[in-house]
Amino acid sequence: MRTLITLLLLTTSVLAQSPAELAISSARNVIAKKPAQFSGYNQLAVALARRARETSDVNFYAQAEDVLKKSFELAPANIEGEKVKIWLLLGRHEFAAALAEATALNRQVPDDVLVYGFLTDANVELGNYDAAEKSAQWMLNLRPGNLPALTRAAYLRELFGDNEGALELMNMAYQATPSSEAEDGAWILSQLGHLYFASGQLDKAADALQTALIKFPGYHYALGNLAKVRIQEKRHAEAVVLLQQRYKAAPHAENLYDLAEALELAGHHEEAQRAFTEFETKSLAESVRADNSNRELIFYYADHAHEPAKALTVAEKEFARRHEVFTLDAYAWALHVNGRDAEARKQIATALAVGIRDPQMMRHAERLQRSEVDRMQASSSPGSDKTVVGMETRY
C-alpha cells in the first residue's frame, strides 16, 4: 500500500508551469513587443512543439504550423523557420517529407548540426540506418560532445545492439543537460530507464524513471517505461496505476493499448476488453494519419482479436510507408499469423540483422524459428507426402 501511495504522489503532482509553457509565454511577449520580427514567431513555434512533446498532444503541432506561416510571411524561406518546419514534420511522423526538406536544407547550410540531426531522425524512422549513422557522425565531427548528437548516437547504438555504448552516451547527454531544463532532463532519464530495462537492470531502470518523475511530475514517457519495469517484476497493479496516469496525461490510442494489456495481466478481464474495444475505435480513426498507432493495431488484431487478415492489411499499409525494425517486426508477425512463415522469417531476419535485441522482437524470432523446426519435423515424419516422395526416388 505504501508503494502505491508513493507512486500516486510521484505521478499526480503537477508543475505550476512546464518549461514549454514558460517558453510559450516568453515568445508571446516577444511577439507583442516586436510583431514585425519573424524570429518571435519561430520562437513560439518551437515552444509549441516542445509542449507537444511534453503532453503528447499533436494539436500543439498544428498550432506551431499556423504560427510558422506568419514567420514565412515576414521572412520567406528564413533558415531558422525552415528548421522548425522540419522539426514539425518529424513530430507529425511525416518522415519522408522531413527527409526531403532536411536534405534540401543541408545543401544550403552544410555545417548546421541540427540539420544533420533531422537527417539522422528521418533516416532512422525510415530504416535507412547507414545514412542515419553517417549524419550522426557528422554532428559529432562538427561539434564534439554536443547534446543532440549524443542522444541520437545513443539511440543508434541501441538499434545496433550495443546497449552498453548506448547507456554511456545517454549518461553523457544527461550530464550535459542543464538542471534548469526539467523536461529535457526527464526525457533523457526516461531513455536511460528504458536502456537499463532492456539490459535487465531493473533497479537502475526504476531509479532513473522515478527521478524523471520527480524532475517532471506526471511525465508520460517516464510513466510508460516505469510500467514496463513493474510488469517485468509481476507488480501488475502498480503497472495499471502508472498506465492509467499516462493515458490521462496523454490520451492516445497506443497508450490505451498498453493499459488494456496491463489490465489483462492484472486479471481485470472485462475492463481490459472494454479498453481494447475503445483502442480499436480510436486507432482506426487515426490510421489514415502519419502519426498513428498502426503497430499496436497490428498486434491487437494478431494477438487479441484473432483477426489475422485485418492485421495483415494494416501491416502492409505501414510497411509501404517505412522499413525500420519495429515495422518489420510487426509486418513479420502479421505474416506469421496468416500462415506465411517463410516471408515472416525473412522480415524478422532483416530487422535483427541491424543488431537490435528488443525482447519482443527476439521472442517473435524464436517463435518463427520453432514453427520452421516443427514444419520440417512434420514433413519428414513417416507417412508424410515428402517422406513418400523421398522413398520413391531413392528406390
Residue ranges of model-derived segments:
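Short coil turns that delineate tetratricopeptide repeat
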Residues: 35, 76, 110, 144, ...
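N-terminal leader/linker segments that initiate helical-solenoid repeat arrays
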Residues: 16-80, 91, 100, 370-395
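Structural motif corresponding to the intra-repeat A-B loop/turn of tetratricopeptide repeats
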Residues: 51, 55-58, 92, 126, ...
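Residue-level recognition of tetratricopeptide repeat
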Residues: 46, 53, 87, 121, ...
